[in-house]
From Swiss-Prot:
Its main location: nucleus. Keywords: Acetylation, mRNA processing, mRNA splicing, mRNA transport, Nucleus, RNA-binding, Spliceosome, Transport. One of its GO terms (biological process) is regulation of nuclear-transcribed mRNA catabolic process, nonsense-mediated decay. This is Protein mago nashi homolog 2. It comes from Homo sapiens (Human). The gene is MAGOHB. The lineage of its organism: Eukaryota, Metazoa, Chordata, Craniata, Vertebrata. It comes from the Eukaryota.
Length: 148
């Protein structure tokens, strides 16, 4: 596994629509800082921004999740490009590897299975689900808020 200074992760999902630019974004920086932003203008909701530092054990678990997913072996060339429905971005620096993925929003596994690269997109889909679950848990526990 890479040392903490060789690790960075950023995820973004969003779209511009009826309620403006709505998005969810989070990042883990090498020093353990977790930055979280959730912007929904639905019913004049306000943007939620939170920052917290996580323990090195959380960073190690994050790296383990990424390693286990084998996302670094994937390529987004055949994935659906961002469209009017929205876009997703995932950027990871782990050790000497720097990978970045961009695709459209994925509604369900049906979208994954109908893509040109269902195996690769499935890896991305499940990794994103795991990352969102971890981040929502960390934010919810730390700040006692409902992140969705």
């Amino acid at each position: 596994m890479a040392v903490a200074s060789d690790f960075y992760l950023r995820y973004y999902v969003g779209h511009k629509g009826k309620f403006g630019h709505e998005f969810l974004e989070f990042e883990f920086r090498p020093d353990g800082k977790l930055r979280y932003a959730n912007n929904s203008n639905y019913k004049n909701d306000v943007m939620i921004r939170k920052e917290a530092y996580v323990h090195k054990s959380v960073m190690e678990e994050l790296k383990r999740i990424i390693d286990d997913s084998e996302i670094t072996k994937e390529d987004d060339a055949l994935w659906p490009p961002p469209d009017r429905v929205g876009r997703q971005e995932l950027e990871i620096v782990i050790g000497d590897e720097h990978i970045s993925f961009t695709t459209s929003k994925i509604g369900s596994l049906i979208d994954v299975n109908q893509s040109k690269d269902p195996e690769g997109l499935r890896v991305f889909y499940y990794l994103v689900q795991d990352l969102k679950c971890l981040v929502f848990s960390l934010i919810g526990l730390h700040f006692k808020i409902k992140p969705i």
